Regions:
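Amphipathic alpha-helical polymerization modules
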Residues: 1-2, 244-343
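Extended beta-strand solenoid/passenger and fiber regions
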Residues: 2-101, 143-160
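Acidic-enriched, low-complexity/disordered segments with a strong bias for Aspartate over Glutamate
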Residues: 9-11, 19, 24, 79, ...
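Broad hydrophobic/π-residue packing in well-ordered secondary structure
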Residues: 19, 28, 120, 137-141, ...
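Generic detector of bulky aromatic hydrophobic side chains
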Residues: 42, 138-143, 155-156, 180, ...
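Polar, low-complexity export/assembly segments characteristic of proteins
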Residues: 102-277, 281-284
Length: 343
């Protein structure tokens, strides 16, 4: 699948980095050292999650990004070592600087295949913004859900059938209009493409909201477990340790709730944007219908006029027509005779 993006399509998001949890035998001092941190990252969302981390065929790449500005094109891919493939459950998946530091890598971007997201390093992000670069991303996906959009309706893509070993190429759907000639030298585009009516970003926005809600639910469950442990013990040292752990978890909860609220705000903005896109598509469809209706009315009037003229000609009385023709011929002959005498 090939998706096209602009520099303005990159989101700035916050993620909570935390390993705060109950561990048997930990002291109050050790729990006090546990701290949730918020990292700011730069993210690109693909139109799908649960993408593939392996090539579908031996001849394609798992992930590649082509950056274009001016006459310059730069490639960032798994093959050239500039992009790492990670899971959203991997440590520091959303903190590329920390990931490179811990793993001894030097990636400029992380492809989180199961989340369908790309986290950019600061250098690559700065390059895209400074150059106002456009870029395209190629990736693979081999499992589709019933609710997933059909990629060939939105993107240039290649489909590979693992049974028949047949490869089908789908061109970029942009400009695939169906035009009908509705009158002399007048054509009308009758179709509205799905990509012009239904924005794919709404699906991914909902995925993100679902994920951050899950993060909040998870920390709430950890707090509830700690409260149960506090209620079931009479050891004052353990109560103090668990109290410190609970405080740390509550701090993490506040951070995650803050991020969840931001996600809700993004969601409302996205809903308004998608609604506006759909309204424009509906309005254009209505305008097409009105133009077609006007053309139909005009052609209907022309048909009526033509049929009336034809009827007048066909329904004329033969005797009257002969008399009229004879009179016209006599007048013509008299005119010729008079002209000849004058000359």
């Amino acid at each position: 699948i090939t998706e096209k993006f602009k520099s303005t399509d990159i989101d700035t998001i916050r993620n909570v980095e935390s390993d705060i949890k109950y561990q048997d035998g930990m002291t109050q001092e050790e729990y006090a050292k546990l701290e949730a941190k918020v990292n700011t990252g730069y993210r690109i969302q693909l139109s799908y999650n649960n993408c593939s981390n392996q090539p579908i065929t031996g001849g394609n790449n798992v992930f590649s990004m082509s950056l274009t500005y001016g006459n310059t094109t730069e490639e960032y891919s798994v093959d050239n070592g500039k992009v790492g493939v990670v899971s959203q459950n991997d440590a520091y998946a959303y903190d590329i600087d920390r990931y490179n530091q811990v793993n001894g890598t030097n990636y400029e971007a992380l492809y989180i295949y199961d989340a369908g997201e790309i986290v950019l390093g600061k250098t690559l992000y700065s390059t895209i913004q400074e150059k106002e670069a456009n870029f395209s991303i190629d990736y693979t996906k081999n499992k589709f859900e019933k609710s997933d959009i059909r990629p060939e309706m939105y993107f240039k893509c290649d489909r590979y059938d693992t049974v028949s070993m047949k490869k089908t190429y789908f061109a970029d759907p942009s400009g695939q209009n169906i035009n009908y000639e509705v009158n002399f030298s007048q054509t009308l585009t009758v179709n509205t493409q799905a990509k012009d009516a239904f924005d794919t970003e709404i699906y991914r926005c909902l995925d993100y909201i679902e994920r951050v809600i899950g993060d909040v639910t998870d920390v709430e469950n950890r707090i509830a477990d700690v409260e149960k442990k506090i209620a079931n013990t009479s050891d004052q040292d353990e109560i103090a340790s668990l109290g410190t752990l609970k405080t740390s978890l509550e701090n993490e909860q506040q951070l995650r709730v803050s991020i969840m609220n931001e996600a809700f705000g993004r969601g409302l903005t996205m809903v308004n944007k998608c609604e506006a896109t759909l309204n424009v598509a509906v309005a254009e469809l209505g305008a097409k219908y009105n133009r077609l209706q006007m053309t139909q009315d005009r052609l209907s009037d022309e048909k009526t006029d033509t049929e009336e003229k034809l009827s007048n000609n066909e329904d004329m009385d033969i005797a009257d027509a002969v008399i009229g023709l004879t009179q016209a011929d006599n007048l013509y002959q008299a005119s010729l005779s008079a002209t000849a005498k004058i000359l």
